[in-house]
Amino acid sequence: MHILKMKKHSIFGSALLSTALLLGACGDNEEVTATVDSSQVQNEFGFQAFELDIDTADQNDAIEASFDIDVSETEAEYVNKLESKDLTGNEAYTELEPIFKDLALTKDMSKEDVIEKVSKAFGAEDYTEFELEVEFSDGDNQEFSDTK
């Protein structure tokens, strides 16, 4: 009887721990809850997904920006250690939107042009490592990387 009680408590404890971990993970929400018109955004930005990672001599992962829009949701995250910014969701989107509009990236741009425009827009022209993955509005995926 004592073993059965312990087993019951062990299962209950595991379920409780699993629930706590699941709820804790939900707190790291990158979802943009503000209304975002996906077709308008794709026309303005020229892309539907953007994943950037820039290292500088002084700071690994100095800048990380991610944006993904689809029919059901939009996600955004922006970390800029050079400016002490760590934003997710609506705050990240508000910060990234004007940068993305100014970039005016197209899939026909050269690697050099893309890297120059993006590193300048994010204030990281002196990067040591640059990695960018973009999914353009037509679904074409391109990767741009450089090391200095």
Language-model regions: role of each:
Residues 3-13:
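Bacterial N-terminal signal peptides that target proteins for export
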Residues 16-18:
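Hydrophobic helical h-region of N-terminal Sec-dependent signal peptides
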Residues 120-144:
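Short, exposed beta-strand-loop hairpins at the edges of beta-sheets
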Residues 35-56:
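Post-signal peptide N-terminal segment of mature Sec-exported envelope proteins
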Residues 61-125:
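Mature extracytoplasmic domains of secretory-pathway proteins
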Residues 47-49, 60-62, 127-129:
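Extracytoplasmic
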Residues 27-30:
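Bacterial signal peptide processing site
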